[in-house]
Amino acid sequence: MITQGPPKFEVNREETYRRLLHFSVRQIISQEDPFGTHLSVKAGARMASDLSKHLGIEILSHEQVIKPELLNEWRRINNDTYNYLKHAERDPHRSLPVFDLPLLNRLQTLLNAVNFKSLFGKQTAHINLYTAYFSATEPDAQKFINFPEEFWLGLKLFPDMKSRESWKTVFLDIPEVQSEYLKDTDDTLFSQQ
């Protein structure tokens, strides 16, 4: 029975957020289903927002990185997709207009990665490599993200990093990522008697 006896283990907010973030990063780089990915991405964003308010730590928000003229559209599409997936009871026959959900996931995951460092003062291999992945593979990132010009100039130094397929092939083979992945997916925690 699931509820008999003591819990198998406990996780704190930091570990939960890290696991959601790492899962989202792996899903994005592996080019997995964007709808399932969106749920983990938005759960991480919600956790960051709630922790930020509770701990009094400022985090990076959409308002700081999305250009003002695109902010309302961003919010509408991002929230509509999440609410559609979360609240089937509201209108079970409704269809969802799908825009660039993978792009929304990639951008929100970048914010989640930055916010993990702000909230917990830590970086992981997943976070460092995801930041490089996003910067290298997002051809239109400069159109909607307010990063300093030096950031964009620096990307031109690494033209071979633009292929998402290359990242998909090598990401999990990077030793630091492999180590974090094994920790994140250690199911012995769930199966201990």
Which role fits each region the language model picked out?
Residues M1-E10, T37-G44, Q64-L71:
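Phosphate-binding glycine-rich loops and adjacent basic patches that engage nucleotide phosphates
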Residues E32-L60:
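Short, contiguous, well-structured surface segments enriched in hydrophobic/aromatic residues
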Residues N12-R19, E32-A43, E73-D80:
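Short, well-structured alpha-helical interface segments that form or flank functional binding sites
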Residues E63-L172:
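Long, charged low-complexity segments
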Residues S166-Q193:
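C-terminal non-catalytic accessory extensions
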Residues M1-E32:
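Charged alpha-helical initiation segments
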Residues Q27, M47, L85:
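Short alpha-helical functional segments enriched in proximate histidine and acidic residues
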